């Protein structure tokens, strides 16, 4: 693990936090930022690949962690409903393709996981990478947010400060899906 002197870490956190001041704040009705990322098999996947379909993009911190596993499994439990309603589910984290493959295999996840490596440029475009606090420490990390993109490529709904274990249920209730 790479270690930096504390003054370097503080500088990086302050510098990256200032960069957030210049990030675009997305809102409902905005065009969803286009992206191309690699999936668990190193295939390039673009948002535009799903033009004409609704897409759920959920950003999560890390594969195989308690909250992220609950969130992924909640999407898996509701997979049939999303399929029946022609909705694509994309999970995005900074984990690499090999980590995603293991996570998918371990929990038999039926949807696509994409890797957004540091500096997490796609997550930053979606206001989903920034300063976090945990146990009194500040660090830069993936922020758990979910976006519903309509069939025209516009942001239909934004879910921030989500409860990981019931995120998919929440979307299904909002859209009145069955």
Question: Which role does the model predict for each range below?
Answer:
Residues 20-178:
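Chalcogenol-based redox active-site neighborhoods
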């Amino acid at each position: 693990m790479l270690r930096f002197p504390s003054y370097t870490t503080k500088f990086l956190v302050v510098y990256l936090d200032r960069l957030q001041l210049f990030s675009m704040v997305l809102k409902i009705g905005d065009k969803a930022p286009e992206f191309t990322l690699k999936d668990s098999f190193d295939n390039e996947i673009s948002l535009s690949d799903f033009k004409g379909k609704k897409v759920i993009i959920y950003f999560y911190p890390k594969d195989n962690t308690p909250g992220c596993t609950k969130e992924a499994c909640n999407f898996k439990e509701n997979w049939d409903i999303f399929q029946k309603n022609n909705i694509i589910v994309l999970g995005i984290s900074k984990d690499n393709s090999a980590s995603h493959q293991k996570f998918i295999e371990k929990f038999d996840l039926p949807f696509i996981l994409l890797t957004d490596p540091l500096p997490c440029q796609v997550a930053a475009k979606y206001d989903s990478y920034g300063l976090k606090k945990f146990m009194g420490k500040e660090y830069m990390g993936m922020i758990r947010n979910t976006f519903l993109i309509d069939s025209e490529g516009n942001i239909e709904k934004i879910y921030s400060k989500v409860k990981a274990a019931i995120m998919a249920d929440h979307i299904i209730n909002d859209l009145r899906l069955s």
